[in-house]
Amino acid sequence: KHIAIDGKTICAASNNRLNHEDPEEGKLHIISAWVREDGISLGQVKSDEKSNEITAIPKMLETLDIKGATVTIDAMGCQVDIAATIVNQGAVYVLALKKNQPNLYESVEEYFKWARTEPIEKKQLKEFSYEEHEHGRHIYRKVEVCNDVSWIETVREWKQLSSIICVTRKGEREGHQT
């Protein structure tokens, strides 16, 4: 099963929002675990702020039976401890990597730049691409998969890290790039 974990700020809800000078302060932020195939929520936890997802996600994971699942989380959840928690509970993870992990991000970015210049017979990347139309846009996606992660200096910190995936998305709507 695929369990997607994501945080959302509920804009119309607040914790006594009228008493705050900053309109962003006091908004309700919820972390949810969603089973994609079944369309059901496994659970939700309140987070004081979006930045607190890093501490809220492990607490929620402790309450869930995720054994045998693939758990996906956006870049906020791309943390060594969260990856270890998922693996320790018998699941596998797919975590989005962005610049909140600057050293790992830079290593991955440099690797893909290098790998793309290698001759096809030496390439360590598997490549897939597809196009689709959605919401009035023409979308092109290229997916590159590297199953050799030995080049990552911090690979031992990331429990059972086995692949790095790069997704490049280009969109066009009415002749304009999106």
Predicted feature residues:
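Conserved, well-structured functional cores that handle cations and Mg-NTP chemistry
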Residues: 1-73, 78-81
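Short, surface-exposed basic-aromatic patches at helix termini and helix-loop junctions that form
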Residues: 83-91
